[in-house]
Regions:
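Conserved S-adenosyl-L-methionine
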Residues: 172-183
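Conserved class I S-adenosyl-L-methionine
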Residues: 1-40, 43-51, 58
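A conserved beta-strand element that flanks and buttresses the S-adenosyl-L-methionine
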Residues: 109
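A C-terminal cap/extension of S-adenosyl-L-methionine-dependent methyltransferases
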Residues: 137, 184-262
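Class I SAM-dependent methyltransferase SAM/SAH-binding core
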Residues: 52-97
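A short glycine-rich, Lys/Arg-flanked "PGG" loop and its adjoining helix->strand segment in the class I
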Residues: 121-135
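Acceptor-substrate binding/catalytic loop of class I
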Residues: 147-165
């Protein structure tokens, strides 16, 4: 097994039902999938980084067609078993060079994974496979919030201004929203500096991604099992805030809905 390969990291960081994670993280997962379900109705959908089986049944039932890709063979193999009986298509594929024909999808979804990709190659491919007027929907961590930590294996994080610029370069019309405001900004800013040094030593120097992940999980408190069904997740009443000036240093999660303007 290629322990430190990108595919291995993708498999390790995929959130599967039954996995133990900090309770607060359930809110992030539930929120992003419920946002997606509001966009799925009668659409041909492509989910990039399909990974986990969370909300697959709901997406399949709402959509006209569901297609999912993941670069990890292990993720797709497990997903095929857990989604047996659902009318969907799953492939091992690279989001930077996809197998699909032009103008194939109404909606492309990329949840909490765009920072693992070459953004320009990714957007070029999404532009190609989206139908005119189609939607790219993704969520990502806000790099401008104090306390931000990059994920092991990630390539690059963009702030909202940078996202706006590159999306418009590819002729998308983006709308941004922020969710889950950070607390104690000043205190977290100082704490983040210390944590970044610790992380650099564990991940970059020692190469121990799994140790860092476990340490971060324990720092967030007690762990809980990820439910199998989306309606078993805790109810999330988080209200999103529209971001109009392309700058935000408060919200931990950024949601972007971009229309294919071509």
């Amino acid at each position: 097994m290629e322990k430190d390969s990108f595919k291995s990291v993708m498999y390790e960081y995929t959130e599967w039902p039954g996995d133990l994670i900090p309770y607060d993280d359930l809110h992030f997962i539930s929120h992003r999938y419920n946002k997606v379900l509001g966009l799925c109705d009668s659409k041909d959908i492509l989910e990039i980084g399909a990974g986990s089986s969370i909300a697959k049944k709901e997406m399949v039932n709402l959509s006209k067609s569901y297609t999912g890709i993941d670069i990890s063979e292990k993720n797709i193999s497990r997903l095929l078993k857990e989604c047996e009986g659902l009318n969907l298509s799953l492939y091992v594929d690279n989001a930077e060079s996809m197998q699909f024909e032009d103008n194939s999808f109404d909606l492309v979804i990329a949840l909490a994974m765009v920072y693992y990709l070459d953004i320009e190659k990714f957007l070029s491919e999404v532009k190609r496979v989206l139908k005119p007027g189609g939607i790219l929907f993704f969520c990502t961590s806000n790099v401008d919030v104090p306390g931000f930590h990059s994920a092991p294996g990630s390539k690059k994080y963009l702030n909202i201004g940078e996202w706006n610029e590159i999306l418009r370069h590819y002729n998308f019309s983006p709308e941004f929203e922020g969710g889950f405001p950070q607390k104690s900004i000043i205190k977290l800013g100082l704490r983040a500096k210390l944590i970044s040094h610790i992380k650099a030593f564990i991940v970059d120097t020692l190469g121990l991604n799994s140790l860092w992940r476990r340490a971060r999980e324990l720092s967030k408190g007690s762990l809980t099992s990820i439910p199998k069904q989306l309606n078993d997740f805790p109810e999330v009443k988080e209200e999103l805030v529209k971001i109009k000036n392309h700058e935000d240093k408060i919200h931990k999660i950024i949601y972007c809905k971009s229309y294919n303007a071509s």
